[in-house]
Amino acid sequence: HPAETIRYCDYPVYPPISWSDGQQVRGLAPELVKRLFGALGYRVEVVVLGNWRRCLLNAAAGRVDLILAYRTPARDRDLAFSTEPVLREDVAIFYNRQRPVRIQSLGDLAGYRGGLLFGESYGADFDRFVGRHGNVEWVSDSRQNFGKLVRQRIDYIAHERRTGTLFAERLAGGENIRALPEPLTVDYLRVAVSRHSPLAAKMDEIDRALRGYRDDGSIQRWLDDSVRDYRCLAGNRADAW
């Protein structure tokens, strides 16, 4: 009998985790999902939505079976998260070296103007800080955000380190973009399954598979492949993000 199809939702603007080559979704996330759930006997349909919040809402409602996401108490209600993380992610402060930022603690950021993406969480402490001080400009896409940093319209960006570094490489003036070595927050990307999905009964199998992929080096290899492929494509296409 044909394999049962499961729906995986992605918003592919986070190389090397997920990105689009113009035809399909590429990167560590779709590769991992196809391998893992293929091995469990499923066919994977990739659903691309126009922003990250819509993926979260669709997973919560059971319209898609899974996403890759950070675990938060609010998300726990509707999503079952893998205990085994897919990847450690480090949110860094990016700045323009022509206007360096001096930051010892979170409070020091209040004196600078930041650029952030709608709908993103950057860790509870930082989110609270932003709510209190509010010295930020909100944008809907990273290209716009990093462009403002190059032109010194803003002083800093909070962004996942790997992704931000790849973005900066692509930009005219990007050689002036630097990241502070100290992470703002550290979080772990996990497989997040809708509690409405039959997959929610398979979390033990999912964890076992993730452990295997980590221990045999597969996750690191897929990540390295994605960085290489993205750089190669981005080098050939001006609009690649």
Labelled PLM ranges:
Residues 12-15, 26-35, 96-132, 137, ...:
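Bilobed "Venus flytrap"/periplasmic-binding protein-like clamshell domains
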